[in-house]
Structures are given as C-alpha cells and as structure tokens.
A protein has these predicted regions:
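Conserved C-terminal "lid"/linker of ANL adenylate-forming enzymes
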Residues: 60-89
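AMP-binding/adenylate-forming catalytic core of the ANL superfamily
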Residues: 1-64, 81
C-alpha cells in the first residue's frame, strides 16, 4: 500500500510543484497510480524535467514506477483536502 501522506511527502520536496493530483485506477485487478503535477507559474525547470525528477524520487521512495505528467499552471483545482487530490477511476 502507498499512503497519500507518503506521496505528498515526496512531492512537497519539490518547491516547483504548485498543485498535484494522484489518479488511482485498476487494470486486471491491479491498482495503478498516475501523478499529475502542476508546476509553479514562471518556474525555471522545464515541465518535462520536473516530471522526470519527481518520477525518480517516487521510484526511490516506493520502488515502483509511477508515471508523472505535467499540466499547465492553473489547470488543477486548488485542493485543501487529500480526498480532492486522490481521484479514483
């Protein structure tokens, strides 16, 4: 099991991340995660590089390959609760 607080701890190490969502889905009875990050507006690191760094940090923390993709600043809703950041599909 991967707990939301553990994922948040990894993501919050990156000051370039303004907001994020974790999408949880099931394929062939296996749970899968995808992390969607919204970079800070005006950030100095390209979004693709940020996604790669986060993916490596998640792999290091959980020994799993979790896909990470970036979206444009202002795309994700502001989330004040974990339940709005974790989406089950």
């Amino acid at each position: 099991n991967i707990y939301p607080t553990a994922v948040e701890k990894v993501l919050r190490r990156f000051s370039e991340v303004a907001e994020y969502q974790v999408i949880q889905s099931t394929r062939d009875s296996m749970a899968e995660l995808e992390v969607v990050v919204e970079p800070q507006s005006g950030g100095t690191i390209p979004a693709s590089e940020l996604s790669s760094r986060i993916a490596r940090a998640l792999h290091s923390a959980f020994a799993l390959r979790i896909p990470v993709r970036s979206v444009e600043p202002g795309t994700l809703p502001k989330a004040e609760f974990k339940s709005r950041r974790w989406i089950k599909q």
